[in-house]
Amino acid sequence: MGLRRGPCPAALLPGGFLFLLLLADPALLAGRRPPVVLVPGDLGNQLEAKLDKPTVVHYLCSKRTESYFTLWLNLELLLPVIIDCWIDNIRLVYNRTSRATQFPDGVDVRVPGFGKTFSLEFLDPSKSSVGSYFHTMVESLVDWGYIRGEDVRGAPYDWRRAPNENGPYFLALREMIEEMYQLYGGPVVLVAHSMGNMYTLYFLQRQPQAWKNKYIQAFVALGAPWGGVAKTLRVLASGDNNRIPVIRPLKIREQQRSAVSTSWLLPYNYTWSPEKIFVHTPTANYTLRDYHQFFQDIGFKDGWLMRQDTEGLVEAMVPPGVPLHCLYGTGVPTPDSFYYESFPDRDPKICFGDGDGTVNLQSALQCQAWRGHQEHQVSLQALPGSEHIEMLANATTLAYLKRVLLGP
């Protein structure tokens, strides 16, 4: 934590006391540590729910709860049969008239821990290794002198929704950044991962340049899907269990489709060729020009509306307007296109390309296009062999972040 000002300016202290104060607090000699805000990615922070439902999908499902419980991540809710209860609670309901989502009847979902780090350090409150996310990075920040909930804070959000439905979140984020600036005497470093980078870019593109110059020191982007992600088509078509064996892809597909953020992350034409075939089937092939037909053929017409609602949220050629550090994984086989023998209800064969296992390399490299389009520096750092989640604990990542925060 940076030094807070006492009732007397340091310059008025007797020389001996000032010398002792400098010895006691090396931060005064080295300069203030910039406060840090962490923005997680898709699935990247806890969600809590409270129930008072008119009906349930199975007699084993809870109909009513007295208090909020952990909806994500709670591994006990992903067991066979019980997972049906979980899907019915965590899904969103799309309203075609309002072009917005709502919670299912009798379900209230909230995001715990805004301004804290616990919600994104461990996705599972039991702190199981399966749910470890930002923990190693936060531990490193603490080792460098930071204090949880003070000069390093988390900015969790409802990652099921795209930014256009999370307006209050961005107001709270701006207020927190301004508060940290006042408390710690300098601009903030934003550290985002995965879809959190798209959220951060959306936020920065809507702030005045004078505000960004004052309040933002740097933006560190880890594994950013600037141009969308190819695997999103597989998620929408046949579901993706993320290699969790107890979950069948078709079982989880309903929840994944209902999250508007899924359609938001489909590949964009400013990164991929309009001729590239992402999905091959016996009767049709699909490029990014075929999304309308794709959604028709998978039986999810609302998905096309969701895509139309979100496609223009982030402007590809409008840079963030702050010093940007893009760190991205390479050399990890990453889903690039999909071959279906039976479409869409069977798992496809996958053709792999370069990337971090989730984000395709060409999408991560999209930040290169901002060089020369903003006065601030745009730096790129490859992380060879670094997987999408593992990069948060990667030694190169942490050393790079330390240099950004504390200097060489």
Swiss-Prot record:
The record ties this protein, via SUPFAM superfamilies, to: alpha/beta-Hydrolases
What cellular component GO annotations does this protein have? extracellular space; lysosome; membrane; nucleoplasm
Q: Name one GO molecular function term.
A: O-acyltransferase activity
Membrane topology, as annotated: Peripheral membrane protein
Q: Where is the signal peptide?
A: 1-31
Task: List the disulfide bonds in this chain.
Answer: C61-C85
Q: What is this protein called?
A: Lysosomal phospholipase A and acyltransferase
The scientific name of the source species is: Canis lupus familiaris
